[in-house]
């Protein structure tokens, strides 16, 4: 990591309610430059809500947060200029070609496409999409759409990346290329905030992980730190995740099968 003291994501008591339901409960979180931070949790735990607030797409009910040094509530445009956000599923314009979509993304960020076209070409080649970028997006497979969206996310060289399931729909070779790319970006000082259900990816890529359950951040740390907190010896991240979030164990699964 480039500078472990450069704070790029800072949330204090970040809260979100929808009616009477608390989707996020007083989240405190710090993420640093050059860090790949895994954000993990069961479906409905609050991961997407958190990401949407940190990217300025959803207004918090309470608390505060800053990304890349800018307040998400009072300086959302400055935040958006410095981040890249890959949603799951990604939103693409189907009646544009891949190139036209990337030109549109560059225009949104106020970046002349000529200044980033070489970067776009290199990323397209890395993800093996360069021969199809002239085709309409409506004809793309799920994996091709994911690749194009990722190139768009990286096009303006953002300081902080928010990635929701970045390897979804990718073949093993492309998934490996994406993982290697993210590691290199972190090595160059970028912050990668990664939400994934593939715990093996988080275990092998992330410097630290945060586990959220029912809107509460219940654990934060490196794998070794989480093992120590849970007194779990050499447990895998998957075992720790299931232990902390109350997932079914082997005995419970066997009981269900025997009863059916």
Regions found by a protein language model. Give the residues of each.
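Conserved ABC ATPase "signature" region
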Residues: 103, 107, 114-132
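ABC ATPase "signature
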Residues: 220-221
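Catalytic Walker B motif of ABC-type/P-loop ATPase nucleotide-binding domains
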Residues: 161-165
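A short, proline-enriched helix->beta-strand linker immediately N-terminal to the Walker B motif
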Residues: 155-159
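Helical segment within the ABC ATPase nucleotide-binding domain
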Residues: 175-188
């Amino acid at each position: 990591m480039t500078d472990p003291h450069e704070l790029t994501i800072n949330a204090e008591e970040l809260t979100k309610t929808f009616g009477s339901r608390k989707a996020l409960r007083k989240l405190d979180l710090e993420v640093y430059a050059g860090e790949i931070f895994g954000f993990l949790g069961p479906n409905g735990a609050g991961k997407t809500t958190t990401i949407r607030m940190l990217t300025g797409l959803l207004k918090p009910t309470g608390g505060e947060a800053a990304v890349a040094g800018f307040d998400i509530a009072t300086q959302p445009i400055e935040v958006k200029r410095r981040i890249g956000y890959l949603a799951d599923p990604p939103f693409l314009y189907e009646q544009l070609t891949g190139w036209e979509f990337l030109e549109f993304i560059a225009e949104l960020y106020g970046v002349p496409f000529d200044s980033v076209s070489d970067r776009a070409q290199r990323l397209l080649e890395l993800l093996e999409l360069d021969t199809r970028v002239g085709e309409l997006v409506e004809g793309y497979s799920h994996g091709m759409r994911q690749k194009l969206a990722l190139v768009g996310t990286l096009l303006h060289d953002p300081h902080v990346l928010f990635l929701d399931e970045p390897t979804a729909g990718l073949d093993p070779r492309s998934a490996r290329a994406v993982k290697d790319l993210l590691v290199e970006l972190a090595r160059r000082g970028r912050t990668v905030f990664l939400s994934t259900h593939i715990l093996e990816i988080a275990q092998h890529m992330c410097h630290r992980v945060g586990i959220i359950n029912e809107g509460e951040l219940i654990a934060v740390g490196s794998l070794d730190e989480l093992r120590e907190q849970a007194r779990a010896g050499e447990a895998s991240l998957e075992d720790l995740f299931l232990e902390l979030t109350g997932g079914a164990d082997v005995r419970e699964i066997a009981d269900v099968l025997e009863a059916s």
